[in-house]
Amino acid sequence: CGIKPDVEITDDDNAAIYFSSGTTGFPKAILHAHRSLVHSAIVEQKHHGQTHDDVFLCIPPLYHTGAKMHWFGSLISGGKAVLLKGIKPEWILQAVSEEECTIVWLLVPWAQDILDAIESGEVKLDKYKLDQWRLMHIGAQPVPPSLIKRWKKYFPNHQYDTNYGLSESIGPGCVHLGVENIHKVGAIGKAGYGWEVKIVDKDGNTVKQGEVGELCVKGPGVMRCYYNDKKATDEVLKDGWHLTGDIAKEDE
């Protein structure tokens, strides 16, 4: 006890292995360096302006890459993080009230459940202390603009942000909407802090604005490799760019 281990850790050392969901085949082991994890924490803090006074409510399980990366923002800011085991609307609102949460990360079904519970009278907002809740962050799937319109009806002062991310590029943050762009609800956003984004055709050439192509991202959060799978790695990593396999287009 009290003796520091004789080990030197650098940003480029291996830090963690995450697993893909396996939707297109067997799950792949995704190897990330310490640099990836640290950068993801900085990105989260930068995007949402987290400070020591913020309280972040994390509802998804921590084995989910996005949940872990959002939570890391609290480590950078020195703020408090609350982990909630359960997704019932009344549990979420009670946690926000009792823990005085300022930032809450929701998935689309959970936000819909909260709104449905409000509109059915199942929950009464005046029972809870919610005035400190400043930011509703939602993601991990497409967000219907109609959902945010409903949400603003009951929470008109909330900031809103969404993002695009994937485990190979350390979860959320490589593309995010930004709280200043609520008028662009339905879009995934622009390049996140420290990230580059491009959209390419089948030959790898950057497409023009408005044209459809493959979304590619580049930044400190890109994985090192698929562990022990060079073939799969070489298919998606090109000159530092991660070819996501997702289709996108750039608007104005």
Predicted regions and their residues:
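Conserved S/T- and glycine-rich ATP-binding loop of Class I adenylate-forming
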Residues: 14, 20-23, 31, 56, ...
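Gly/Ser/Thr-rich phosphate-binding loop
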Residues: 76, 101-106, 115-183, 196
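Short Gly/Pro-enriched turn/cap motifs at secondary-structure boundaries
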Residues: 6-8, 185-191, 206, 236-240
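Short beta-strand->loop structural element characteristic of the AMP-binding/adenylate-forming
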Residues: 28-31, 58, 80-86, 161
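Conserved AMP-binding/adenylation subdomain of ANL enzymes
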Residues: 38-55, 63-103, 117-118, 124
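Conserved ATP-binding/catalytic segment of the ANL
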Residues: 205-210, 214-252
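Conserved pre-ATP/AMP-binding loop-to-beta segment of ANL
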Residues: 2-19, 26, 49-55
